[in-house]
Structures are given as C-alpha cells and as structure tokens.
Curated annotation (Swiss-Prot):
InterPro entries: TM2, TM2D1-3-like. It is a multi-pass membrane protein. This is TM2 domain-containing protein almondex. The gene is amx. Residues 52-63 have a biased composition (Low complexity). The name 'almondex' was given due to the slight almond-shaped eye phenotype of some mutant fly lines (the '-ex' denoting the gene is located on the X chromosome). Positive regulator of Notch signaling during lateral inhibition and boundary formation. Interacts with Notch signaling at the membrane, at the level of gamma-secretase-mediated S3 cleavage. May regulate Notch signaling by regulating the subcellular localization of N/Notch in a context dependent manner. Maternal neurogenic factor involved in Notch signaling-dependent mesectodermal and neuroectodermal specification during early embryogenesis. Functions cooperatively with bisc/TM2D1 and amrt/TM2D2. Required for maintenance of neuronal function. Belongs to the TM2 family. It comes from Drosophila melanogaster. The keyword Translocase does not apply. Residues 247-249 are cytoplasmic. The lineage of its organism: Eukaryota, Metazoa, Ecdysozoa, Arthropoda, Hexapoda.
C-alpha cells in the first residue's frame, strides 16, 4: 500500500499577499527601531548634559553627602528651608518611598520607625569614617554613625565591615547601571553609562560614576525564526524583511533571490550570526 504525499499548493495571489505582509512588517519594524533609537540618543544627550552641569556645580561633593531629590528640595523651599527642615523632609521622603516598596525593611532609607536597629541602616542614613590608607582588597572595620534627625533603636555609632576598594572597583552585582538601546550590539561595541553602588555597599570615593559596558540588548528577533524563513521564503526576500532590511529585501524579491545565489548567501550569513536585525539588537 503506497503512502500518498500531501503537498500544500500556494497560488500566485496568496504568495503576493504573503510577500506584501513581510514587506510592510519589515518597514514598520525598521521605522520603529530608528525612531526609538533617536529618542534614546536625545535622552542620553540630555542626561549627559544634566550630569555634566551637576558635576560642575558640585565639584566638592564627597561620598558622605546625602543626595536630596528635587521633590524634597521643593518641599524644603515651600516649608521655609533650614537644616532641621531639610533633614526632616529627607526622612519623610525616604519613608514614603519605602512604604510603597515591596522589598521590605532591607530597602528602607531613613525610616521614622524607632524600632529599627541603628546598625541595620544603610546609606544615605549613615556616615562612615573611611580609612583611605587601607590595603586594597583587605577587609576592615569602619566606624559609622547615624545622621541627625534619624530615629533608630540602639547605639547610634557602630562598627561595620567593608572591603578596601573604591566604588568603581566593586562587582557588577553590587552596582545599578543604566542600560542603552541606542547602541549596535552586532558590532560588539562599548557604551558609557552612569552606575551607582547599592545602598548596603561601603566603598571609597564617589558612589556614582561612569563606566563602559558592552552593548547587549534585544528587540524580540529570534535566530531560529530568521533561519527558517531564510530556508523557506528566502528567495522572495522574506528573511530580509523580517530582520528589518527592507531595502535589500525589495532587491532580493525582484531578482528572485539573486537567481538563488543571494538566497544561499543569506542562509549562510544568518546561520553564522553574521546577518542580524537592522536595528543593531541581538537575537533571543
């Protein structure tokens, strides 16, 4: 008994509709990616300008100073200012933000709760006397003291252990860095971003700094999907449209895949990860 093979027959109208869908999708994805990248570039330029102005105006800042958010500064201005009012508003702002956080008491900053042990407080609620002459990489004990107008339980001066190193030398899991989606991940480039160490980390120098990170972001393109489309519909330029290279996709469509040569080349390029999304993102 012979087995009959079932074939799927696609007429010319269905093929044209399918190709037009890939063309419109590729154009839309490329325009969306380019528009998002321009917005990210403008935002990064604005952030860089704000950071440069802040650094020029606060050249004498050290790691023991408490950062005052703009909202708190406006609250202080409305209340009449003063050192005592400033610290009161700092604690009020910190307690309100900690109440809305779901991470519990570990992330509280300057709480009003008198039952909180003083030795559990973190930056910026404490100030520590750092020994800048310590040996790099060695663990040492430093004396920390709770800042004024912060209520806590126990001794306001206590010992805490730290590792002798500057803040920019801490591990990556001890830092929070801003990510950028305006860089090209395919070329394996580096980009400069702002990083800040976590509140529970004690270190020397400025707690906020800039560093170079490797560009690594995705936009939802799958390598397996791109390879499958290239193997099946590569002759119509569907793989190029899927990845956002719609200009090359149109040329590939009207040349019937470069008479088969272009199709084979694209299959090899996609399989070896040489051909990626047009927006510079990585495959997922």
């Amino acid at each position: 008994m012979r087995l009959q093979r079932q074939c799927i027959v696609v007429n010319m109208r269905s093929a044209i509709v399918l190709i037009m869908i890939f063309v419109l999708t590729g154009i839309r994805n490329s325009e969306t990616a380019s528009g998002g990248n321009q917005m990210d570039l403008s935002d990064s330029k604005g952030d860089h300008k704000d950071n440069s102005n802040a650094s020029n105006g606060n050249g004498n800042a050290n790691d023991n100073e408490v950062y005052v958010p703009p909202l708190v500064s406006s609250m202080v201005a409305k209340s009449g200012g003063g050192a005592g009012g400033l610290l009161d508003n700092i604690t009020a702002y910190s307690s309100s933000s900690s109440s809305s956080s779901s991470n519990g008491n570990n992330n509280m900053l300057c709480p009003y709760d008198k039952e909180t042990p003083c030795d559990r407080l973190q930056f910026p609620c404490i100030r520590c006397n750092y020994n800048h002459g310590c040996i790099y990489g060695r663990d040492l004990n430093v004396t920390c003291e709770v800042i004024n107008n912060v209520q806590c339980l126990g001794e306001r001066s206590f010992q805490r252990q730290m590792n002798c190193r500057y803040c920019y030398q801490t591990e990556m899991w001890q830092q929070s860095c801003g990510q950028r989606s305006s860089c090209n991940s395919a070329t394996d480039k580096l980009f400069r971003t702002n990083c800040t160490v976590h509140h529970d980390v004690l270190c020397l120098g400025n707690r906020s700094f800039t560093r170079n990170l490797r560009c690594n972001w995705t936009q939802g393109y799958r390598w397996s999907t791109a390879l499958l489309i290239s193997l099946t519909l590569g002759g119509f330029g569907a793989d190029r449209f899927y990845l956002g290279h719609w200009q090359e996709g149109i040329g590939k469509l009207f040349s019937f895949g470069g008479l088969g040569v272009w199709t084979i080349i694209d299959v090899l390029l996609i399989s070896m990860h040489y051909l990626g999304p047009a927006d510079g993102s990585l495959y997922i």
